[in-house]
Amino acid sequence: IIGGDECNINEHRFLVALYTPRSRTLFCGGTLINQEWVLTAAHCDRKNFRIKLGMHSKKVPNKDEQTRVPKEKFFCLSSKNYTLWDKDIMLIRLDSPVKNSTHIEPFSLPSSPPSVGSVCRIMGWGRISPTEETFPDVPHCVNINLLEYEMCRAPYPEFELPATSRTLCAGILEGGKDTCRGDSGGPLICNGQFQGIASWGDDPCAQPHKPAAYTKVFDHLDWIKSIIAGNTDASCPP
């Protein structure tokens, strides 16, 4: 996270970290949405990874931290054909449920779509420098604004993004606050609701007039609920 500060230890009980067991590298975030399921970005998928819940500092473990491995992973259309503007979403079933504790509690799915102009909070253990490989020991949090989708489309003509999309655009137009490498898959929380999954942005991060894109959770609710209910053939919205 660029331009943020250390998150309050109590404000991210639903935030999980995806990491590789050997190198202990945190490569993505995710959101616990109930005792057994985590929502993150499809591009965060790796062959072998673990999920750390209830974590704050990488160096000083919370007593109630839990580790899980993915039992099942679900993608849109049961394929990994996501693009920059579509279907960058992955639902992970944990190998065993987690109980609520001091630093672990799921975040409910949104009850209504977000509105442009909302203040949104982003969080993660990703880079805190736009240009250097500087990663914090604790998650950083910062507030950004929900922008018109066009503001993510116009600055990136090379991506040929479609006129409408199931992504949200969020950032600060003057730059300086943004998600960055390592924050992918983490939540975008607008007016207290879990509305987005960090998907992609510019490199270097946090440049003026280069906001980032987030998968729109609200548009995928039917798919998420169907998978959790056991209908594993469900497909994402077209």
Curated annotation (Swiss-Prot):
Inhibited by diisopropylfluorophosphate (DFP), PMSF and leupeptin. It is an enzyme of class 3 (hydrolase). The keyword Cell division does not apply. SMART domains: Tryp_SPc. It comes from the Eukaryota. One of its GO terms (cellular component) is extracellular region. Glycans are attached at residues 81, 100. Gene3D superfamilies: Trypsin-like serine proteases. Residues 1-229 form the Peptidase S1 domain. GO terms for biological process: proteolysis; regulation of blood pressure. Keywords: Disulfide bond, Fibrinogenolytic toxin, Glycoprotein, Hemostasis impairing toxin, Hydrolase, Hypotensive agent, Protease, Secreted, Serine protease, Toxin. Expressed by the venom gland. InterPro entries: Peptidase_S1_PA, Peptidase_S1_PA_chymotrypsin, Peptidase_S1A, Trypsin_dom, TRYPSIN_HIS, TRYPSIN_SER. Its EC number is 3.4.21.-. PANTHER family: KALLIKREIN-1 (PTHR24271:SF47), KALLIKREIN-RELATED (PTHR24271). Belongs to the peptidase S1 family. Snake venom subfamily. Thrombin-like snake venom serine protease. Cleaves fibrinogen (beta chain of fibrinogen (FGB) and more slowly alpha chain (FGA)) without inducing fibrin clotting and cleaves kininogen to produce bradykinin (KNG), resulting in the reduction of blood pressure. Negative results: does not coagulate human plasma. Does not inhibit platelet aggregation induced by ADP or collagen. Monomer. This is Thrombin-like enzyme halystase. It comes from Gloydius blomhoffii (Mamushi).
